[in-house]
A protein has these predicted regions:
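Expand to "…catalyze enediolate/carbanion chemistry for C-C bond making/breaking, isomerization
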Residues: 1-121
Length: 121
């Protein structure tokens, strides 16, 4: 799984959007720090970056009428089986949140979606 370029979030089909939510939940919880080739860069940033990215996913879900468990809106929450952060420090974020989400990464994501038979407008 990958984190989709944030410019694509509003265009993601339902399965990819909901899958991204599940991926963010896993990474925020016990998956934090577990190596995976396509998301290793996430662990070079503060967990606050992942929370902020996940917020974008959850906001898109809400705009489409999906209900998100409210506990995930708490920056300190890490899932039912993972201890919460005491007080995860907020940080000033860039745009995009992850500097790795550049033009080349955008094209990789579009190509990945195309390989799945998904053409974006």
């Amino acid at each position: 799984m990958r984190l989709w370029h944030e410019a694509l979030i509003s265009q993601l089909p339902r399965p990819q959007l909901l899958g991204q939510h599940r991926e963010c939940c896993a990474l925020r919880g016990n998956g934090w720090g577990r190596r995976h080739a396509t998301v290793d860069y996430v662990f070079t940033h503060s967990p606050y970056h992942l929370y902020a990215y996940h917020r974008l996913i959850m906001e898109e879900m809400a705009s489409r009428g999906y209900r998100v468990s409210p506990e995930w809106l708490d920056k300190n929450y890490r899932g039912k089986t993972c201890p919460s952060y005491e007080d995860l420090p907020e940080e000033k974020l860039g745009n995009p949140i992850y500097s790795e989400h550049d033009a080349r990464y955008y094209e990789e994501c579009v190509d990945n979606l195309r390989e799945k038979g998904i053409e974006l407008e």
